Amino acid sequence: MSSRPLTIGLVAGETSGDILGAGLIRSLKEKVPDARFVGVAGPRMQAEGCEAWYEMEELAVMGIVEVLGRLPRLLKIRRDLTQRFSELQPDVFVGIDAPDFNITLEGNLKQRGINTIHYVSPSVWAWRQKRVFKIGKATNLVLAFLPFEKAFYDRFNVPCRFIGHTMADAMPLHPDKQAARATLGIAPEAHCLALLPGSRNAEVEMLSADFLKTAVLLREHFPDLEIVVPLVNSKRREQFEQIKSSVAPDLRVHLLDGQAREAMIASDAALLASGTAALECMLAKCPMVVGYRMKPFTFWLAQRLVKTQWVSLPNLLAGRELVTELLQTDCTPDKLAAALLPLFADSDKTAALRTTFVDLHQQIRCNADEQAAQAVLELVKPR
């Protein structure tokens, strides 16, 4: 029997992965207090005791130009990690998200006899589905947030475990709408709309004008309408303000630094870009409309690559259209406003929608950190 402590290799490539990694380490330490954690870690993972061979910022690059500029460094780091983990022989290696970096690394380590886990499934079920074969070769197990992801991997006999979603664990089943309104300074009885035009430069550029024009149309129906716009950082805020000054200079809005979750909980309805925001909005029990537009060629390409009937996670989870999706040429102020209007009514339909949101929340609320830790320990080879 080896006297070496349980050793887990970890690589996180961005802030979301750092949060997941920290939760995983916490849960593992509860079960194995003397375990050692080592690899590429952000500040949260390091605060939980993970030894960082490299800082996470080294991997956190976005955009083709930036990636190309950093490629020699990224390849060097991956070669070095392959060598160091091969020498260390951790009991299990966990690559957290960052699939372009981690899946190749996982494959290298699996070939060297190390059990590997990929934590957070890439969207292989939606596009570039053939990646599933590479993932199957590179990993012993995929940890998936959503049940339809596991169903996809099962079709290809790739080991996958559905662990639930950490966001579903973090959010209450029945959020306090009035408390959120008090936090944001929204009147208790006012109609309230959240606008979330995305977190990326291109999204804010493509969507903000039509989202603002939609809000102007809704204000005509609801003179007391409060409009809250959470923006992820100062760059997006500045970009949004510039667009607003030319499109709707007289429209009164509450610009928020972050606070997307509070904005969703406080609102009667939300208009948002697709992505994780739609899942968060569902967990906030806020009825929504998804509006999205891309450059024409990008949309043409996406239509040929994307294999799913819907783009928003609430619809994918439900297996039916719960949430109206207005994409590309359908993403117009008139159509967006027409889809949003009924959501402000306290009707049986909106009540049923919120009940369905609660049911879906319960489906993916499984204590993901604990489930992930259990999956890691089950892959540890007997010594």
UniProtKB/Swiss-Prot annotation:
InterPro entries hit by this protein: Glyco_trans_19
Pathway in which this enzyme or protein is active: Glycolipid biosynthesis; lipid IV(A) biosynthesis; lipid IV(A) from (3R)-3-hydroxytetradecanoyl-[acyl-carrier-protein] and UDP-N-acetyl-alpha-D-glucosamine: step 5/6
Keyword Glycosyltransferase included in the entry's annotation: yes
Top-level EC class as recorded in UniProt: transferase
Stored CDD domains: Glycosyltransferase_GTB-type (cd01635)
Any one of the GO BP annotations: lipid A biosynthetic process
Catalytic activity: 2-N,3-O-bis[(3R)-3-hydroxytetradecanoyl]-alpha-D-glucosaminyl 1-phosphate + UDP-2-N,3-O-bis[(3R)-3-hydroxytetradecanoyl]-alpha-D-glucosamine = lipid A disaccharide (E. coli) + UDP + H(+); a lipid X + a UDP-2-N,3-O-bis[(3R)-3-hydroxyacyl]-alpha-D-glucosamine = a lipid A disaccharide + UDP + H(+)
EC number from the UniProt entry: 2.4.1.182
Superkingdom per UniProt: Bacteria
Membrane-spanning ranges: none
Any one GO MF annotation of this record: lipid-A-disaccharide synthase activity
Alphabetical UniProt keywords: Glycosyltransferase, Lipid A biosynthesis, Lipid biosynthesis, Lipid metabolism, Transferase
Gene Ontology cellular-component terms listed: membrane
One Pfam family cited in the UniProt record for this chain: LpxB
Family: Belongs to the LpxB family.
Function, in words: Condensation of UDP-2,3-diacylglucosamine and 2,3-diacylglucosamine-1-phosphate to form lipid A disaccharide, a precursor of lipid A, a phosphorylated glycolipid that anchors the lipopolysaccharide to the outer membrane of the cell.
Name used for this protein in its record: Lipid-A-disaccharide synthase
Naturally occurring in which organism (per UniProt): Pectobacterium carotovorum subsp. carotovorum (strain PC1)
Gene: lpxB
